[in-house]
Swiss-Prot record:
NCBIfam families, per the entry: PRK00094.1-2, PRK00094.1-4
First-tier enzyme category under EC: oxidoreductase
Binding sites annotated in the UniProt record for sn-glycerol 3-phosphate: K104, G133, S135, K188, D241, S251, R252, N253
Pfam families linked: NAD_Gly3P_dh_C (PF07479), NAD_Gly3P_dh_N (PF01210)
Pathway(s): Membrane lipid metabolism; glycerophospholipid metabolism
Reactions this protein catalyses: sn-glycerol 3-phosphate + NAD(+) = dihydroxyacetone phosphate + NADH + H(+); sn-glycerol 3-phosphate + NADP(+) = dihydroxyacetone phosphate + NADPH + H(+)
The protein's name in its UniProt record: Glycerol-3-phosphate dehydrogenase [NAD(P)+]
Keyword Nucleotide-binding: yes
GO MF assignments: glycerol-3-phosphate dehydrogenase [NAD(P)+] activity; NAD binding
Keywords in alphabetical order: Cytoplasm, Lipid biosynthesis, Lipid metabolism, NAD, NADP, Nucleotide-binding, Oxidoreductase, Phospholipid biosynthesis, Phospholipid metabolism
Biological source species: Chromobacterium violaceum (strain ATCC 12472 / DSM 30191 / JCM 1249 / CCUG 213 / NBRC 12614 / NCIMB 9131 / NCTC 9757 / MK)
Length: 334
């Protein structure tokens, strides 16, 4: 399969390395100097310094060249880059291939999910979907086993892409609940910040398990309010992604929580991180949406208080753990 991967950050580079083992891949970035450097060094030294590019991986800063004859375009930018990239693609004087995105989050200001942004920018009958699931870029680039989801409202399209790109080391599963997959992929980043704070304060593994489980309940309530299936939250893009992001040492959002627990201000944390942590921007959008839909999301509210209102990390987590008891008989809906 001929692929164009748009975005040469950590995840874009990792997917390009992984898919180039079995497919024709062109990795695109807007910055011509970045592409020149990547081409000369044949490695993304900033994000994946120990993961060299395969010889067959092509590089380009020309969007038309990268997308030419591609059978599939995969957009791997931060959420803020999705709409501009879609606009640039639709402006090309060429047929538009089917599109997947690996962006996770809600658009700042509009609170739109990725597929809602795509609906505004792509032709009504265009094939599109999301790639999401528990996957750290470094491990995928190193060829370690992983499993992710291809989600689309067009079930046959999702199944076809999953079959084409599936490999023993990167297993792909199709899902027709696009909303559920996107919500799971977005909100788990908020929960990872909370879990990172608890870990940083040495609250212990019991507290971590409680936050992850109740975080899953929050994600499920919001997803259902948006029309998703609760079953999706039990899959790779729900529980799977949540567990990895809340516990993995490579999780950027968990690192944000760990650093906040040290008493560092948010701006310093983000500067030290040097990477995009989508949960920071997503938290505010999620809370706004939850309030509009009247969905109870106490962990999200606590994270927003920590990020934007200067609340003390110790008091934030302690307050969550001291909330009034309630029945769990209704499962994830309570």
């Amino acid at each position: 399969m001929k692929l164009a991967i748009l975005g040469a950050g950590a995840w874009g580079s990792a997917l390009a390395i992984a898919f180039a083992r079995h497919h024709q891949v062109t990795l695109w970035a807007r910055d011509a100097e970045q592409i020149r450097q990547l081409g000369e060094e044949r490695v993304n030294r900033r994000y994946l310094p120990d993961c060299p590019f395969p010889e067959q991986l092509k590089l380009s800063s020309d969007l038309a060249e990268a997308a030419h004859d591609a059978e599939l375009v995969l957009i791997v930018t931060p959420m803020a880059g999705l709409r501009p990239t879609l606009k640039a693609l639709t402006a090309l004087d060429a047929p538009l291939p089917p599109i997947l995105w690996a962006c996770k989050g809600f658009e700042a200001g509009s609170s739109l999910l990725p597929h809602q942004v795509a609906e505004e920018e792509l032709p009504a009958d265009h094939l599109y979907g999301a790639l999401s699931g528990p996957s750290f870029a470094r491990e995928v680039a190193q060829g370690l086993p992983a499993a992710v989801t291809i989600a689309s409202d067009h079930a046959e399209f999702a199944a076809s892409v999953a079959r084409e790109l599936h490999s023993p080391l990167l297993r792909l599963y199709a899902n027709d609940d696009l909303v559920g997959v996107e919500v799971g992929g977005a909100v788990k980043n908020v929960m990872a910040i909370a879990t990172g704070v608890a870990d940083g304060l040495d609250f212990g593994m019991n507290a971590r398990a409680a936050l992850i489980t109740r975080g899953l309940a929050e994600i499920t309530r919001l997803a259902m309010a948006l029309g998703a299936s609760p079953q999706t939250m039990m899959g790779l893009s729900g529980m799977g992604d949540l567990i990895l992001t809340c516990t993995g040492a490579l999780s950027r959002n968990r690192q944000v929580g760990l650093k906040l627990a040290e008493g560092k201000p948010l701006q310093q944390v983000l500067e030290e991180l040097g990477h995009v942590a989508e949960g920071v921007a997503t938290a505010r959008e999620v809370l706004t949406m939850a309030e509009r839909l009247q969905v109870d999301m106490p962990i999200t509210a606590a994270v927003c208080g920590l990020l934007y209102q200067g609340h003390d990390p110790q008091q934030v987590v302690d307050g969550l753990l001291r909330r009034s008891p309630k029945s769990e008989s209704g499962g994830l809906l309570d």
